[in-house]
């Protein structure tokens, strides 16, 4: 639990693996202890649960995956947002992420769209276990692959540069999420990223939009 807490605090993905459904190597049903272990792993803040022998050599690989997925989904709604504990050494990104967490508790947000070149902001958002889906937009395939493991994150790759985020880049990100069916035009979203190009890639933008209103605004001001 301490390792998971520390990883969450630093925005590091946590994979919990090995013998999570060991009985399902030979049985089609899990034990109560295994169900409890999976549920507690999710509640503790794991990013990913991994099966090994259950799917590599077990008699019930599909049932094992289905069982683990079902248990995880059942308990995900009970996860509480994780607040920042150390407020003495906050970065720009920490402050933005904490603000997003508080906004989500005040107003109904459907999705958080984060434009990220290195994935750091997406990792920090994922570590807070927020209710809205996090749509992470990047231009790099390597970062896209890395973000697939993050809790609650749906990564999307787009073409072009995101070093300096203008309204056109924001529009491109939102349209990519729309095309994938992750958000709709009636959704309320939070949009975050880095407006200016810094060597340290500081996250310094936080906007709230209704998708259709933002797209109409950009179109009228082209």
Regions found by a protein language model. Give the residues of each.
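Long, charged amphipathic helices and adjacent flexible linkers at domain junctions
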Residues: 9, 68-101, 221-222
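Hydrophobic faces of well-ordered beta-strands that scaffold small-molecule active sites
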Residues: 14-18, 42, 49-51, 134
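Active-site-adjacent loop and "lid" segments of alpha/beta metabolic enzymes
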Residues: 21-40, 84-98, 102, 138-141
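Glycine-rich phosphate-binding active-site loops on the catalytic face of alpha/beta enzymes
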Residues: 38-61
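C-terminal helical cap(s) of enzyme catalytic domains, especially alpha/beta-barrels
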Residues: 55-77, 203-209
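Nucleotide-binding motor/catalytic cores of P-loop/tubulin-like NTPases across gene-expression machines
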Residues: 121-123, 129-167
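C-terminal binding/interaction regions
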Residues: 180-192, 196, 203-216
């Amino acid at each position: 639990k301490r390792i998971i807490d520390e990883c969450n605090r630093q925005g590091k993905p946590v994979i919990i693996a090995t013998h999570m459904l060991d009985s399902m190597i030979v049985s089609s049903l899990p034990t109560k202890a295994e169900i409890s272990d999976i549920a507690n792993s999710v509640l503790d803040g794991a990013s990913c649960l991994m099966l090994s022998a259950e799917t590599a050599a077990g008699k019930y690989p599909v049932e094992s995956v289905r069982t683990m997925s079902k248990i995880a989904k059942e308990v995900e709604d009970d996860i509480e947002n994780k607040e920042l504990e150390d407020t003495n050494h906050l970065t720009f990104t920490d402050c933005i992420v904490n603000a997003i967490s508080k906004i989500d508790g005040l107003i109904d947000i459907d999705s958080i769209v984060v434009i990220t070149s290195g994935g750091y902001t997406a990792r920090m958002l994922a570590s807070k276990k927020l209710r809205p889906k996090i749509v992470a937009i990047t231009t790099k395939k390597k970062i896209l692959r890395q973000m697939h493991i993050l809790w609650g994150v749906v990564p999307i790759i787009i073409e072009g540069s995101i070093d300096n985020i203008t309204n056109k880049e924001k529009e491109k990100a939102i349209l990519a999420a729309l095309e994938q069916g992750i958000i709709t035009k009636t959704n309320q979203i939070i949009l975050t990223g880095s407006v200016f190009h810094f060597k340290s890639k500081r996250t310094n933008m936080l906007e709230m939009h209704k998708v259709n209103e933002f797209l109409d605004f950009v179109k009228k001001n082209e």
